[in-house]
Design a protein with these regions (language model features):
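Acceptor/aglycone-binding surface of glycosyltransferases and processive sugar-polymer synthases
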Residues: 66-82, 99-181, 208-224, 237
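Donor nucleotide-sugar binding loop of glycosyltransferases
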Residues: 12-15, 43, 72, 98
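Cell-envelope/extracellular polymer assembly enzymes that use nucleotide-activated donors
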Residues: 2-4, 35, 186
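Conserved donor nucleotide-binding strand/loop of the catalytic core
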Residues: 34-37, 48-82
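Short, well-formed alpha-helical segments that are part of the catalytic scaffolds
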Residues: 12-27
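Short aromatic/hydrophobic "clamp" motif used to bind/position activated sugar donors
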Residues: 88
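A conserved acidic beta->alpha catalytic loop
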Residues: 40-49, 95
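Catalytic donor-sugar/metal-binding loop of nucleotide-sugar-dependent glycosyltransferases
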Residues: 153, 178-179, 188-206
Length: 239
């Protein structure tokens, strides 16, 4: 079984060497058949050069780059469509959820009939360890509002750690269009419409960076995006 790990990145020169060492070392140690895809979403700080150097040493490490910056959704979609794995996972370049959860997710795929597995900070009691009370409350409230608006039963639509069976990944993301942060919701809506079985796995945030989401500023726009996406996905001809 081949495992693909996708790392979207944008201007990550300060952490890219550590990210390469961490993810490469983990994949090499834990899986026999694997690929590691870094997708450079129009970075201007040269972070892709380190990936190019590693790829020259080991072709299982791949760099996909493009300009201009299009957003995380575009980066994840690009990686998914280029993947060749039987299981395809994406996670954040800063290794926010640690590496142990990667093998945990692969094992859950092996032991279940899920086609899609969503990481969730709301399953484990320690999922929000290290968050301030205000940030934890804001995050939980934001996610609850989005779930209600989207009509989801899933507890953490915006977690940056998700996995798919390869065939499902490539079919779902062929039908995705959203380039920025609402892409998670769109992908899950499409997965539901295609009839894929969706599960969740508990994750814990172990590396904290300041969130790019401002709850007060972004929630109204996100809700408008969700309403528009629900209509688009419902009426869309899927391929």
């Amino acid at each position: 079984m081949k495992v693909t790990l996708i790392i979207p990145m944008y201007n990550e020169s300060s952490i890219i060497n550590e990210a390469i060492d961490t993810f490469y070392g983990y994949m090499k140690e834990h899986f026999g058949d694997w690929e590691l895809i870094f997708v450079d979403d129009g970075s201007v700080d040269g972070c892709g050069k380190a990936v190019e150097a590693k790829s020259a040493d080991d072709s299982r490490v791949r760099l996909i780059s493009y300009t201009p910056n299009m957003g995380k959704g575009c980066a994840v979609r690009t990686g998914m469509l280029a993947s060749t794995g039987d299981i395809v996972i994406f996670t954040d370049c800063d290794n926010a959820y640690g590496t142990d959860v990667i093998e945990k997710m692969v094992k859950q795929f092996e032991e279940s009939d899920f086609d899609v597995i969503l990481g969730s900070r709301n399953i484990s009691a320690d999922g929000y360890d290290g968050y301030t009370f205000i940030r934890k409350l804001a995050s939980k409230t934001y996610l609850k509002v989005l779930s209600i608006a989207a009509g989801f039963k899933y507890s953490d639509s915006q977690c940056g750690f998700k996995g798919y069976r390869g065939e499902a990944a490539r079919r779902i993301f062929r039908n995705c269009e959203v380039n920025r942060f609402a892409f998670d919701l769109e992908a899950t809506m499409i997965a539901q419409r295609l009839g894929y079985k969706i599960g969740e796995i508990g994750v814990k945030v172990i590396n904290h960076r300041e969130s790019k989401v401002n709850v007060l500023r972004d929630t109204p726009k996100m809700l408008a995006d969700v309403r528009r996406m629900k209509k688009n996905v419902k009426n869309k001809t899927l391929v």
